[in-house]
Amino acid sequence: MENMDLIKRNVQEIVTEEELTKLLETKKHPSAYTGYEPSGKIHMGHVLTVNKLLDLQKAGFEITVLLADVHAYLNQKGTMDEVRKTADYNKKCFLALGLDPEMTNFVYGSDFQLSPEYMLNVLKLTQATSLNRAKRSMDEVGRKMEDPKVSQMVYPIMQAVDIALLGVDVAVGGIDQRKIHMLAREGLPGLGFKAPLCIHTPILLGLDGTKMSSSNENYISVDDDEAALKKKFKKAFCPAEDIENNPVLELFKYHITPRYDEMVFERPEKFGGDLVCKSYAELEKVFADGSLHPMDLKNGAAKYLNEILEPVRSVLE
């Protein structure tokens, strides 16, 4: 697969493709980062961006992972000691998912976010950002709160400064990070920093058909064992012949087919015998025309995700 195809695989948006093309033409090893707030278990929604970092690493990018312990503290996710322990757990998960330990730079927010240089740039960006703009950049939970904390408005400002001081070319995140990334593109040049390119991945559906979230308990954790996976998929929303907003198909599209050249769905002879698919497009077709039953799709998802997550479970045991 060509580098540009790897970079664009399973991406919802690139801001901008023209800038990306120029970057690849002028820099042999561009840099990219994703920040993760250490606030709970890593689930397959998080792994979407890890997959993209893996693609970028294969395409020659230098990768930085920000373990944003200060962000988590400001977002009321625990004491600094608690969020640091969660950050260490995150790091183990990301390495077990395939990030190259020799080619990935893991940075804790507390390593640089408390420095005078960092805080001065945060203050400069707050001066250049309106209150309404800061509110729009808050996460969904913060925007819906009747009386959010000031720290929750500073959070997106800090995220923009993270990009600047880490010195990366590309910011990677879910499409829900778009407003923060646009704030960085608009505000950082005024502080003397370059505007980052942005790569946005989709938001993964939870097993009930809504957004995958630890708070909704509709997620697959990277440390779920085989029994837990089978139990969760048995209850998963997966209407027959429906390829729109189907969470089980999404898991194949974003997590399984990029890792397997072919998928075998094991079935008794009386139900047609084993069915082999060699691409996501082929899988979607046989599910849409009724050749593949939802339960067979679910069983296949449980089997392949169990294999994908085995290295993570081994590290965490």
Curated annotation (Swiss-Prot):
What Pfam families would the database entry show?
tRNA-synt_1b
Q: Where is this motif: 'HIGH' region?
A: 38-46
What is this enzyme's EC?
6.1.1.1
Q: Does the keyword Ion transport apply?
A: no
Question: Quick one: where is this thing mainly located?
Answer: cytoplasm
Give binding positions for ATP.
Answer: S214
* Keywords per UniProt: Aminoacyl-tRNA synthetase, ATP-binding, Cytoplasm, Ligase, Nucleotide-binding, Protein biosynthesis
Q: Which residues bind L-tyrosine?
A: Y33, Y155, Q159, D162, Q177
> Entry's InterPro entries?
aa-tRNA-synth_I_CS, aa-tRNA-synth_Ic, Rossmann-like_a/b/a_fold, Tyr-tRNA-ligase, Tyr-tRNA-ligase_3, Tyr-tRNA-ligase_arc/euk-type, Tyr-tRNA_synthase
Q: 'KMSKS' region: where is this motif?
A: 211-215
On the tree of life, the source organism's domain of life is Archaea
- Localisation: Cytoplasm
Database matches in NCBIfam families: PRK08560.1, tyrS
Family in the record: Belongs to the class-I aminoacyl-tRNA synthetase family. TyrS type 3 subfamily.
Task: Summarize the subunit comment.
Answer: Homodimer.
Q: What task does this protein carry out?
A: Catalyzes the attachment of tyrosine to tRNA(Tyr) in a two-step reaction: tyrosine is first activated by ATP to form Tyr-AMP and then transferred to the acceptor end of tRNA(Tyr).
The name this protein carries in UniProt is: Tyrosine--tRNA ligase
Record the organism. Answer: Methanococcoides burtonii (strain DSM 6242 / NBRC 107633 / OCM 468 / ACE-M)
